[in-house]
Amino acid sequence: KIMQTFKEYHEDGEHERVKERIAILPGGFKPPTRGHFLAMQDLLNDAERGIVYIGKGERDGIDATKSKAIWDIYKNYLSKPTEVHLSPISPVKDTYDYALDNKEVDIIVGAGGPRKLKGDTFTDGDMKRYESFIKNKDKYPHVTLKEIESKEDIKGEVVRAAIKANIDDALINYFPDMSETDKDAIKSILTA
């Protein structure tokens, strides 16, 4: 907003906020898709900067190092500065550790909610992993848990299969818009 009335200024509460706000998006990201990119962008709308924690492990030839290399390209397209870290144990642990060690900042943690899997089965998503932030509000008063809506129902196994079938189509259908140079870089990462 460029201009607002005095009443609006006091009602929105922004004038009272003095703590820095950090958005955290933890996950596996094998690979990071357009949906992940859009989720981080959405979280950054309410923060000054972001942190992505990437889980270890490998799925169909895509490991954490490849995932980080792709996020390092994505962060150039995000609206706010974003750090990308490989989690030595798990993104969940790193998120809780960061919250415990950084009580002087406000933290927004993004986690996927319930969604449909194959057939008629559903998953609870990742929200359950971060319930302690809600249950222990006295311990984590500076943390807000934000459910990430599945704007695009893109599943990792579908993306990995599409990459194997036709990587050029996969880049168009499952990855964010970016320069041809960056698309080529991601293609090289995924086919290495």
Residue ranges, per PLM feature:
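Nucleotidyltransferase catalytic core that binds NTPs
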Residues: 4-192
